[in-house]
Amino acid sequence: ETATMVNAHAQRNGDNEICGYFDTRGRLWGGPDVVRIYFVVQLDKVAEHIDSWADGIYEPGKNTVAASKRSTRREASGWSYEDAPTAGLKVKFDVQPGDQIQLKTSVSFVSVENARLNMSAECSHWDFDAVRKQSQTEWNEWLGRIDVDGGSDNQKIKFYTDLWHTLLGRHKIDDINGEYPDYTQGERQGTHTINAQFKKRQLPLNNCLLYTSPSP
């Protein structure tokens, strides 16, 4: 994904959650000129202190951050590779040697609420080993659909690595409740859509049930 993140907003929500959104722009492959991605990050330990920074300005004790909307396109870069000021939140914990902190994150192209719903439906627990086992089982099922005979070990490694990359890049854009973003309205310029307008759409319920897998 050759895109630049701008206009990021993040805030603390309660003792153990950070949520917000950011806009992505500058896609080499085309599509909408700006796409917003919402996110939720949950922690299994209370955050004692949060600092923020944006565009080189550090603000201790501030639980929210709003990043710049501006970005600068690099010379001879076409539609991609734009530079933008960085921004973020720094989370501090009261920990002792040997303590572990777990976090999980979920995204949505529609809303923060949907990102939270996705997390609740797909990973409502804190069992790390169960998540790892589920991930291994799912990847083995997908990669095991093709058996390769002959060739060297390096050639097989390259084949399965390329297959993994192919599967990894085919993400869903609809949420657990069937809502998805429609950015098809706007001015077409080649493979790009300029001034794309966001519309929230809804998949039929039967489609949602078909593609929903149970949590471990």
Predicted feature residues:
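Beta-sandwich/jelly-roll carbohydrate-recognition scaffolds of carbohydrate-active enzymes
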Residues: 1-207
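Conserved small/polar residues in nucleotide/adenosyl-binding loops
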Residues: 211-216
